[in-house]
Amino acid sequence: MAKKSNTKNNPFISLNSYKDNNKSIFYSREKQVEDALSIIQSSSFLAITGDVASGKSSFINAGLIPRIKNGFNGINGNQWSIVNFRPGISPIENLCHALSSDGNLYISDKSKTTDYNDYLTTIREKNSIGLVEIYRNCEIFSKKNFLIVIDQLEDLYNFPDLFDYNESDDEDLLFDLVSKTLKFKDLGIYFIISIDTGNYKKLSSYDDLSKILSSSQFILHPLNYNDLKEIIKKTFNAKNIQFDSEVMDQFNVLVNETDNSLNPNFQLFFKKLYDICLSDLNQQNGYVNSEKIDQIGDVDEIISVELENFYSSLDEKGKLILEKFFRSFINFDKKNIGYYYQEYSYIKNYTDIDDEYL
């Protein structure tokens, strides 16, 4: 088995997305959160766009949602009910699952077993005003603001073998629900959507939705050099760990000369560096120079290096299973280059391991 770092006091969460419970360690996005909230307040709608791995989901879950829950004023006061879902390949069904989970539309927080079917029937019958009907007939109507988060809308376009948006009416209905609901400005229903930059232009083909996109778009850029300095200040410097100017210069060059987002790379890099530095602090050596950086490796290569180290740490059986696991994702379909899925059952059969191990 691979060694695990001591994460007890580590403010970095590696390659994971930030969640609501990580809000206290979600640094350097405070101004962007307030800027995005001003759009929500004026439009009741926010479209977050950005490059792949720029941190859109983290921005929503650890930035916007905690701030909204903490007394952000809407039409119905400062109390909110929030549902958050990905459209996947069944956008309407997934919306109804989100609506019927966790009692979001009840004061008591207890939903009924019939809610999913009831909501699905209402939307299928009422079409674009289905959400309005559901909200008007629920317990939180006029008592709480209702926020619907549709994260990673690119799901609708990235898996053509499973969901063909040119043939299906469901994504049209989803966007009709959004645009029609927003016309009822006094209800207190709000929307946040996120989509990668490469697919954002597809939204312009939905007439009613396209009319509100230009005033509601928020571009989330990857972390820049000033963001990195702010993160370092609130984490490393707070523990009296200082960085050599040469190291900072290297970071500056890296983020300015790299086209793709390095957010995940820096998250993993800082997590490993923080563990090393805390260990060194016990030896009165809280200083980060090039020598210490070399212990971890280059930021832009750290994910591949970490995977190689993990592979090396496995026994022969583990290595064979990991090789089979990655082989199961080999894709010869030109339509799915860039985004590819594989069914769990296929992976299980190909690797020949049980559910618990997988």
Q: PLM features: what roles do these ranges have?
A:
Residues 1-358:
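Amphipathic helix/helix-loop-helix segment enriched in hydrophobic residues with interspersed Lys/Arg
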